[in-house]
Amino acid sequence: MSRHNARDADETLRRMAEMMANGLKTKTEPFPENAIAFARILDELRALDPDDLKQKLVIGGFVDHPYGLDEQRCQECIYFLVHRKWCDLPELAVPVEPHWWCRLWKI
């Protein structure tokens, strides 16, 4: 990642954290229980402008803390790139904090 991209990612991460801290309401439910439900959420995300960060957060169901009975976190998700603090799900492709969560979480 170039220095410019790292700065962009840091700024995006800051904006995301600020939106959630300010009470952004996101769609944490329903959690997709099967591949069809998961694909529907992906379709919603694909329909967005790739730069529509707020709607990515809303549709993705992001929260800035562990979620659910098992306290799931981005850190345990298969899409989380540890060394970049990045969600590698192509429809999201955003920086994330390890302790955050979204409803596209998968192990």
Residue ranges and their predicted role:
Residues M1-I107:
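Cysteine-centered metal-binding/redox modules
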